[in-house]
Design a protein with these regions (language model features):
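Carbohydrate-recognition beta-sandwich/jelly-roll modules
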Residues: 1-84
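Aromatic-lined carbohydrate-binding/catalytic grooves of carbohydrate-active enzymes
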Residues: 73, 77, 81-223, 228, ...
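Glycan-recognition surfaces
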Residues: 177-188, 199-201, 207, 211, ...
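Alpha-helical scaffolding within the catalytic cores
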Residues: 36-47, 139, 203-213, 240, ...
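Solvent-exposed loop/turn segments at secondary-structure junctions
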Residues: 62-67, 98-102, 159-163, 228-232, ...
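Structural recognition of the beta-strand scaffold that forms the well-ordered cores
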Residues: 51, 55-61, 89-96, 101, ...
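Glycine- and acidic
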Residues: 57-65, 194-198, 222-224, 331-332
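Extracytoplasmic, non-cytosolic globular domains
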Residues: 212-262
């Protein structure tokens, strides 16, 4: 369950589920309701918990800042989360799309954006918005600051390879291949112009993802939201990302979250469990009751398939201060009424959505 508003978005203990939830065996570590009631902390749980043992919870920048989040804004939310929400299970901050675009703006994407890339075409943070990334440091310093607070850092990524890398025919790290060798110019995102697809029948395509994930893992990344994966369903790209994450050798597990969802068929559940920790089951959800209402049917379909380590995701929680520089709408407090917000939280908890 991901908050998407600014630091004013506060909800304590929304992860507590009822006795039936625990009786179903998720999670398999006893009654956390009683644990929470007695201990009022999440810090003493067993150290051997499996990856994504409960639905991941945290904050995502999209609904408030769109493509334009800054380092200072991320750290302000991180400090607030550490002080007020961490002990209730909220522990991950996710930098959403276009952190590598120095011309990023509210309300849309830029054609032919001058993306910041390394010599192998891998994305690097805009050092103006993220000053600690200057000098090729990437998100390493920011991840260290977030980890120091006892939290995790995640980020968004589009599937495929940057068009700029293909136009310049940059080399694929560790191989004799180039970006033009591995690009798939026919399978591109319909709504974001940054990337081409990857030709997964070419061995250099896996090498591209391996090199990209090796870089991201070296920064200390904990969570990766990969977009344009499920509508249509790109099984070869999903599997390639999963393999790349498994190969990254920096001692940290990385949760893979797939987005967006559309109307994902439950027949994909075994494949999704094999390759990801989370997968969206809808398109973007905003602060409109009609968006929330549609999630009842989606979560009803997916609830029987929820299991430790692998979660169907009903999308972020659009509460609090949103729209500051977002894709949709203007600066506002969530338009959902208090009753609608309570209903959303109840539905997400019953459906065990991240």
């Amino acid at each position: 369950m991901g908050l998407s508003g600014g630091v004013a978005s506060l909800f304590t203990y929304p992860y507590v589920r009822d006795a039936d939830w625990f009786a179903a065996g998720v999670p398999p570590y006893g009654n956390l309701y009683e644990y929470q009631r007695k201990q009022d902390t999440m810090t003493d749980l067993p150290q051997s918990l499996p990856q994504a043992w409960r639905p991941p919870m945290g904050w995502n920048s999209w609904d408030s800042y769109g493509t334009t989040l800054t380092e200072d804004e991320l750290l302000a939310n991180a400090r607030f989360m550490a002080e007020h929400l961490k002990n209730a299970g909220w522990d991950t901050l996710v930098i959403d799309i276009d952190w590598y675009d120095p011309t990023a703006r509210a309300h849309g994407y830029n054609d032919n954006a001058p993306l910041i890339l390394d010599e192998y075409g891998r994305q690097l943070p805009d050092p103006v918005r993220f000053p600690s990334a200057a000098g090729g440091k990437g998100f390493g310093p920011l991840a260290a600051a977030v980890h120091e607070l006892g939290l995790k850092l995640g980020m968004h990524m589009m599937r495929g390879i940057p068009r700029i890398a293909v136009d310049k025919n940059l080399p694929v790290y560790g191989t004799n291949y180039t970006a033009k060798d591995v690009a798939d110019l026919d399978h591109v995102c319909k709504w974001n112009p940054d990337n081409y697809g990857l030709n997964q029948s070419h061995p250099g395509a896996q090498a591209w993802y391996d090199a990209q994930l090796d870089l991201f893992a070296s920064w200390g990344l904990d969570f990766l939201k990969v977009d344009d994966m499920q509508t249509p369903f790109h099984s070869d790209e999903i599997a390639a990302y999963h393999r790349a994450i498994a190969k990254a050798e920096y001692g940290r597990s990385i949760d893979l979250s797939l987005s967006p969802g559309g109307w994902v068929a439950t027949s994909y559940v075994d494949f999704l469990r094999e390759n990801a920790q989370m997968w969206r089951i809808s398109d973007d959800l905003w602060d409109r009751w009609e968006d929330i209402y549609q999630q009842f049917a989606r979560l009803a379909r997916w609830a029987p398939f929820q299991t430790t380590g692998h979660w169907a995701d009903a999308d972020m929680v659009p509460f609090g201060h949103i729209g500051l520089r977002a894709e949709r709408g203007d600066d506002r407090q969530s338009r959902l009424t208090l009753d609608e917000q309570k209903t959303l939280l109840a539905l997400w908890c019953m459906g065990r959505s991240p």
